[in-house]
Structures are given as C-alpha cells and as structure tokens.
C-alpha cells in the first residue's frame, strides 16, 4: 500500500518519534525546562537532541512516507502542544533524523482533535490520510467523517506484508 498525490497528516509522539516510558520525576523536570525560551537555532537543536535523546525514529513508517512522497504525496506532521517552543524542537528533531521527509509541522493546541482541524482546512477529504497512534481519539472519528486513517502499527504490518 503506497499512496499517490495525497496529503498525509502524521502524528509525531509515538508515531514518528517513539518514546521510552519516562519516570514521573523525569517528566516533571523535562516540562519545567520548556518554560525557558531558546532563540538560537543551534541551541534549540542541542535541546531537541537532549530532550529526545532516548527516542527512536520510526524508520519503517519513515520509509513508507518517503515512498509516498516520491509518488507525489505531501507529508505534514500534526502535533498537539501547549508550548510553541516544543513544536519547534520537534521540527529540529525531524531535520536531524528525517531531513527532507516532512513538508510542514503544524502545531495544534493541546487537546484539539486533529480530525476537526483536517476537516476545517481540506476541501477534498478523499485526498487526505491520517496516521496516528491514538485509535479512539483520532482514527475512529476520522473514519466516521470519511477520512482515510491508519495506526502506525497497521502501516508497519502492511509494509512488512504481515496481516
């Protein structure tokens, strides 16, 4: 399954970027760091490397997206973030681990439903695909609205031809 000439919206956290489980204290200290604005691009890249140091790029999904992109698809990341700074750090992380793969990173407010955003800006939902790890929150509503939607696990199983 490779798509052609579509807009693919893909989630960042636990979809493209695979996180390890953080202990509660580490999560709190990480969130505290987000309140410090970083204006220098190199400093932001270094911060992104540190913050996402134990994260892995989902290379199977990345290869799939690259094939789609080579077939005329546009690939956009949708991320729910309270802080614009963290969305910028995600852009930097993608530039490091997936240069040229992503056409745009779109920050939605925390808790905003991605399907509602997609439905509000896309005229032809037949040319849209959503890939997200949250089945109940994102995939089911997308399918109800007629938007083609998949979990990263489904894409990876299909890419490996295992179903």
What are these model-predicted stretches?
Residues 3-5, 72, 125-128:
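A general structural motif
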Residues 1-52, 158:
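Active-site neighborhood of HAD-like aspartate-dependent phosphohydrolases
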Residues 27-38, 42-76, 85-88:
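Short, acidic loop-to-helix structural element flanking the phosphoryl-transfer center
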Residues 125-163:
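Acidic, Mg2+-coordinating phosphoryl-transfer loop and its flanking beta/alpha structural elements
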Residues 1, 116-123, 160-163:
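Short amphipathic alpha-helix with an adjacent loop that forms part of the alpha/beta core around
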């Amino acid at each position: 399954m490779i798509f052609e000439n579509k807009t693919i919206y893909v989630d960042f956290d636990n979809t493209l970027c695979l996180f390890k489980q953080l202990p509660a204290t580490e999560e709190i200290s990480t969130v505290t760091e987000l309140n410090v604005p970083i204006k220098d691009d190199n400093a932001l890249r270094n911060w992104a490397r540190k913050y996402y140091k134990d994260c892995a790029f989902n290379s199977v999904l990345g290869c799939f997206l690259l094939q789609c992109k080579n077939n005329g698809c546009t690939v956009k990341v949708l991320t729910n973030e309270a802080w614009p700074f963290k969305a910028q750090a995600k852009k930097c992380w993608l530039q490091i681990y997936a240069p040229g793969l992503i056409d745009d990173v779109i920050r939605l407010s925390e808790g905003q439903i991605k399907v509602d955003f997609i439905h509000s800006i896309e005229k032809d939902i037949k040319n849209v695909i959503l890939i997200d790890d949250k089945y109940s929150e994102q995939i089911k509503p997308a399918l109800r609205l007629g938007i083609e939607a998949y979990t990263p696990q489904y894409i990876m199983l299909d890419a490996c031809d295992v179903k």
